[in-house]
């Protein structure tokens, strides 16, 4: 398929620069695949679409303040570092650095008042760096003190409250971008879902910076996906398999959950618990085995996430729904409105 088929024109003022004051006041477009029907609602009304036995699967990953600004220990030269993901070795991470010429193996950089030091171990084939951190106490607390949230490049305004770039159920630290479909949920909505007979189960997928990487190949099949770390607990796998066997819906909250569940699927449409790395690329023609419905935000033109939702609902339906969203002045991307895709 041609990349250009996933392009659309978005007025710049529809890119949400800030989260709404109230999470659940976001708008909710409800897209029904079978009837091609599109309804306009608000996220706080989501529980009215819940059927008895529905299982909502959420991603409990927490965004880390992964952006650090420091100085070269030997010369004082400035450096920006973005943490990508932890490696096998203790306190070792893969990171991006800017400017790259300052970060050669053996160089040491310091952040804060000697609170944190990073030694460059080597350079990866992709140009990122493998580093080892040295610090006192708890690494997460040091990061919270020194780091900044690496907001998406299309968000130009400063985030007043970093917690608004976290879901209310975020707990497993490791993402460098939020699983944004979950940003609309409040404890009250989760409670209302359960009151309607729905269940909620958790998994973890740490969102990488690759989620913002544009597709550059004219034919989408040639695109190489980035890998992201996931963990599907036994308890969640059990709940999913029970829902599938009962004939209830498994509703993925976000594309990160979709990718995880479709990675761990078995031939009979069930899932296996486990952890690992996924580079699954879902585009039209893909046959979904586990996910029956999904909640998601409005995605960038030509992005792999737009391809994923097009695979689920059909490209023509999604592209016409996006045009309707533009006409109705929906808010787009990370801090924008939501879409519920169901049969």
Swiss-Prot record:
Does this entry carry the keyword Membrane? no
- Name the enzyme group at the top EC level: transferase
Q: Which UniProt keywords apply?
A: Cytoplasm, Queuosine biosynthesis, S-adenosyl-L-methionine, Transferase
What GO molecular functions are on record for this protein?
Answer: S-adenosylmethionine:tRNA ribosyltransferase-isomerase activity
Would the keyword Cytoplasm turn up in this protein's UniProt record? yes
GO cellular component, as recorded: cytoplasm
The record's EC number reads 2.4.99.17
Cellular compartments annotated: Cytoplasm
Q: Name one GO biological process term.
A: tRNA wobble guanine modification
Q: Where is the signal peptide?
A: none
Q: Which SUPFAM superfamilies match?
A: QueA-like (SSF111337)
Query: Which InterPro entries does the entry mention?
Result: QueA (IPR003699), QueA_dom1 (IPR042118), QueA_dom2 (IPR042119), QueA_sf (IPR036100)
What reaction gets catalysed by this protein? 7-aminomethyl-7-carbaguanosine(34) in tRNA + S-adenosyl-L-methionine = epoxyqueuosine(34) in tRNA + adenine + L-methionine + 2 H(+)
Kindly report the protein's main subcellular placement as a broad class: cytoplasm
Which Pfam family, giving just one, matches this sequence? Answer: Queuosine_synth
Annotated pathway: tRNA modification; tRNA-queuosine biosynthesis
Which HAMAP family does this UniProt record tie to the protein? QueA
Function statement = Transfers and isomerizes the ribose moiety from AdoMet to the 7-aminomethyl group of 7-deazaguanine (preQ1-tRNA) to give epoxyqueuosine (oQ-tRNA).
Family per similarity comment: Belongs to the QueA family.
User: Subunit composition?
Assistant: Monomer.
What name does the UniProt record give this protein? S-adenosylmethionine:tRNA ribosyltransferase-isomerase
| Provenance organism | Natranaerobius thermophilus (strain ATCC BAA-1301 / DSM 18059 / JW/NM-WN-LF)
Source gene?
Answer: queA
